[in-house]
Amino acid sequence: MAYPLQLGLQDATSPIMEELMNFHDHTLMIVFLISSLVLYVISSMLTTKLTHTSTMDAQEVETIWTILPAVILIMIALPSLRILYMMDEINNPVLTVKTMGHQWYWSYEYTDYEDLCFDSYMIPTTDLKPGEFRLLEVDNRVILPMELPIRMLISSEDVLHSWAIPSLGLKTDAIPGRLNQATISSNRPGLFYGQCSEICGSNHSFMPIILEMVPLKNFETWSVSMI
């Protein structure tokens, strides 16, 4: 999860987030090189008295500054499109979870089980135990098996919401009357925190999400106890 004064992204928990972090570094390096070139040109113009007042055209320069930006955009677009297709691709999910946004809580339904569904509300600050996080704790966590592809179907009962887990690289809008789909896959067990990421009313900041990824055996034990 995030911590105070953090400058970078959260630690990657899923293959998608790892790809997003690599793409972030790739794009940042390109932006840094372009910015350095622009600053160099500006400083050269301000510090030198040499000018080319007689130059009417320079086809070589015009060709370069037309082709070079196109190449740079292609270098950014290709990995971006690859990640976009990876995020939409779902192959044989082992589990499907339906998530519904409400004002102001989440409800979850494990569609592969007959009666496994529950609501998830934020725990008020006055009820927190020592070591728990303000505005991030919930009464019912989403328990899922790690290292397996899971399909999350996301919608809303009232207004726009957004189900987001930053460490998984996941943010999917919950839209009334529409069912959006996302893929969840975690490389390791643990607790992963998120929040509603779409302003949805006065209690928008009171819609936390806790995703607990556990080994498959532990998940099976939990699911049996919940039915």
Swiss-Prot record:
One Gene Ontology CC term in the entry: respiratory chain complex IV
Ranges facing Mitochondrial intermembrane side: 1-14, 88-227
EC number: 7.1.1.9
Record's bilayer topology term: Multi-pass membrane protein
TM stretches of this protein: 15-45, 60-87
Keyword Transcription: no
A single GO molecular function term of this UniProt record: cytochrome-c oxidase activity
Catalysed transformations (reactions): 4 Fe(II)-[cytochrome c] + O2 + 8 H(+)(in) = 4 Fe(III)-[cytochrome c] + 2 H2O + 4 H(+)(out)
Compartmental location: Mitochondrion inner membrane
Annotated cofactor note: Binds a dinuclear copper A center per subunit.
Broad EC category: translocase
GO biological process: ATP synthesis coupled electron transport
Binding site for Cu cation A1: 161, 196, 200, 207
Pfam families found in the cross-reference section: COX2 (PF00116), COX2_TM (PF02790)
Signal sequence annotation: none
Keywords: Copper, Electron transport, Magnesium, Membrane, Metal-binding, Mitochondrion, Mitochondrion inner membrane, Respiratory chain, Translocase, Transmembrane, Transmembrane helix, Transport
Keyword presence, Transport: yes
PROSITE patterns for this protein: COX2, COX2_CUA, COX2_TM
Needed cofactors: Cu cation
Family under the similarity heading: Belongs to the cytochrome c oxidase subunit 2 family.
NCBIfam families documented for this protein: CoxB
Assembly and oligomerization: Component of the cytochrome c oxidase (complex IV, CIV), a multisubunit enzyme composed of 14 subunits. The complex is composed of a catalytic core of 3 subunits MT-CO1, MT-CO2 and MT-CO3, encoded in the mitochondrial DNA, and 11 supernumerary subunits COX4I, COX5A, COX5B, COX6A, COX6B, COX6C, COX7A, COX7B, COX7C, COX8 and NDUFA4, which are encoded in the nuclear genome.
Purpose of the protein: Component of the cytochrome c oxidase, the last enzyme in the mitochondrial electron transport chain which drives oxidative phosphorylation. The respiratory chain contains 3 multisubunit complexes succinate dehydrogenase (complex II, CII), ubiquinol-cytochrome c oxidoreductase (cytochrome b-c1 complex, complex III, CIII) and cytochrome c oxidase (complex IV, CIV), that cooperate to transfer electrons derived from NADH and succinate to molecular oxygen, creating an electrochemical gradient over the inner membrane that drives transmembrane transport and the ATP synthase.
Protein name: Cytochrome c oxidase subunit 2
The organism of origin for this protein: Malacothrix typica
Gene: MT-CO2
